[in-house]
C-alpha cells in the first residue's frame, strides 16, 4: 500500500516550521506569549508529515499555516505544537 502525503492534498493548507528567530519576531508583532497561540497536536497528520521531512518536531515548536482563499487571497495562522492540546 502506497503512503499518502497529506501535505500534497489540495484541501490541506501550507504548513511551515517557524525558526526560533522568526518566532520571536512573530510573537512580538502579535503582542502575545507563545502559550496563547492555538495548539496543534503532535499526532496531527500534518505534523507527522512534516516530521517525515524535517525530523522530530518537539512541543513548543511554532507552525505557520498559510490558507488560500478565492475571496481573500491568503491568510496566515500560527499554531504551537503541544502534547496537551486541551487543558
From Swiss-Prot:
It holds the Pfam family RNA_pol_Rpb5_C. InterPro entries: Arch_Rpo5/euc_Rpb5, RNA_pol_subH/Rpb5_C, RNA_pol_subH/Rpb5_CS, RPB5-like_sf. It is found in: Cytoplasm. GO terms for molecular function: DNA binding; DNA-directed RNA polymerase activity. PROSITE patterns: RNA_POL_H_23KD (PS01110). One of its GO terms (biological process) is transcription by RNA polymerase II. Keywords: Cytoplasm, DNA-directed RNA polymerase, Nucleotidyltransferase, Transcription, Transferase. The keyword Ribonucleoprotein does not apply. It catalyses: RNA(n) + a ribonucleoside 5'-triphosphate = RNA(n+1) + diphosphate. Its EC number is 2.7.7.6. One of its GO terms (cellular component) is DNA-directed RNA polymerase complex. Belongs to the archaeal Rpo5/eukaryotic RPB5 RNA polymerase subunit family. Part of the RNA polymerase complex. DNA-dependent RNA polymerase (RNAP) catalyzes the transcription of DNA into RNA using the four ribonucleoside triphosphates as substrates. This is DNA-directed RNA polymerase subunit Rpo5. It comes from Thermoplasma volcanium (strain ATCC 51530 / DSM 4299 / JCM 9571 / NBRC 15438 / GSS1). The gene is rpo5.
Amino acid at each position: 500500500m502506497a503512503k499518502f502525503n497529506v501535505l500534497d492534498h489540495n484541501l490541506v493548507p501550507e504548513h511551515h516550521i517557524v525558526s526560533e528567530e522568526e518566532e520571536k519576531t512573530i510573537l512580538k508583532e502579535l503582542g502575545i506569549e507563545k502559550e496563547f497561540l492555538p495548539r496543534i497536536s503532535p499526532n496531527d497528520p500534518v505534523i507527522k508529515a512534516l516530521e517525515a521531512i524535517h525530523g522530530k518536531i518537539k512541543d513548543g515548536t511554532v507552525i505557520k499555516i498559510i490558507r488560500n482563499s478565492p475571496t481573500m487571497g491568503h491568510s496566515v495562522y500560527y499554531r504551537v505544537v503541544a502534547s496537551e492540546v486541551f487543558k
